[in-house]
Structures are given as structure tokens and as C-alpha cells.
Amino acid sequence: MALNLQDKQAIVAEVNEAAKGALSAVIADSRGVTVDKMTELRKVARENGVSMRVVRNTLLRRAVEGTEFECLKDTFVGPTLIAFSTEHPGAAARLFKDFAKANDKFEIKGAAFEGKIQDVEFLATLPTYDEAIARLMGTMKEAAAGKLVRTLAALRDKLQEAA
């Protein structure tokens, strides 16, 4: 279906707004994936705060100009599915990685975070906010417990020497 100039400008503006509000972006090629599976992917994406869209490469190049995802321009070859993570930087990467495991024809082309091209594995393994807080609390708790054990051991040694 041919798009007129106003439609193209609207698409560019919409994708540009999504890019400006996103934490990360992941690019994929979904050729060969059934409509049912893509519909399921879109549903899961919405639940995880990920906005997905298939966009023509020329429009996508214009849409990402001036954003931190401009570094992805070289990956805009062939059919391009772009996903922007708005709530967590690793959400789209994790979603696409899991989907690619179940669907051989789904190919992840690239990802960007903080203005740089990143490995999808790196983004997919980023901890969520809650996971990061839990890790930090665990580390702090371990440090406090270790300090207590060392203090008690030193006190025991001091008492043994005095006896």
C-alpha cells in the first residue's frame, strides 16, 4: 500500500517520539514468522513495556536522526522490526532473545543502549530494577554478616589470650 507524504511524516514523527522516550532499541527481521506468533509477541511486548513496529528503512533512518539510536542506521537492511524498551533497558532484548529461541526464522540484527550498539546478550542479561536492588541488599547483608563474624572471632581470640 502506497503511503502519501502526510502518512510518512506521521510515521516518522511517531517513531521519533517513541525513540526519544526509550531506554534501548532492538532491531530484528521477522520474515518467515507466522502472524499468530507475531501477534503473541506483540501482546507480550505490550505487557513488558515494549513498543514494536515494522517500519520502512528510509522512514526509520529519518525517525532515529538526532536520537541515541542513530548508531543503528547501518542495520536497517531488509524488513525491519524495531522494538523500543520504555520501562527497562533489557526488556526488548530479553523478549526478542526468548522469541528467537522458539522461532528459528526470527533473526535479531542489533541493539542499542545509551547511544552505542550493544550486544543483545548484554542487554538481555541486565538485571531489572528489583533484581538490582535485591543483589545490592544481598551484598550489603553479606558484608555486615562477615564483619560480625570477624569481630566475634577477634573477641574470642582476645578472650582466649587473656585466659
UniProtKB/Swiss-Prot annotation:
The keyword Hydrolase does not apply. The lineage of its organism: Bacteria, Pseudomonadati, Pseudomonadota, Gammaproteobacteria, Pasteurellales. GO terms for cellular component: large ribosomal subunit. Forms part of the ribosomal stalk, playing a central role in the interaction of the ribosome with GTP-bound translation factors. GO terms for biological process: translation. PROSITE patterns: RIBOSOMAL_L10 (PS01109). GO terms for molecular function: large ribosomal subunit rRNA binding; structural constituent of ribosome. Part of the ribosomal stalk of the 50S ribosomal subunit. The N-terminus interacts with L11 and the large rRNA to form the base of the stalk. The C-terminus forms an elongated spine to which L12 dimers bind in a sequential fashion forming a multimeric L10(L12)X complex. The gene is rplJ. This is Large ribosomal subunit protein uL10. The keyword Nucleotide-binding does not apply. Pfam families: Ribosomal_L10.
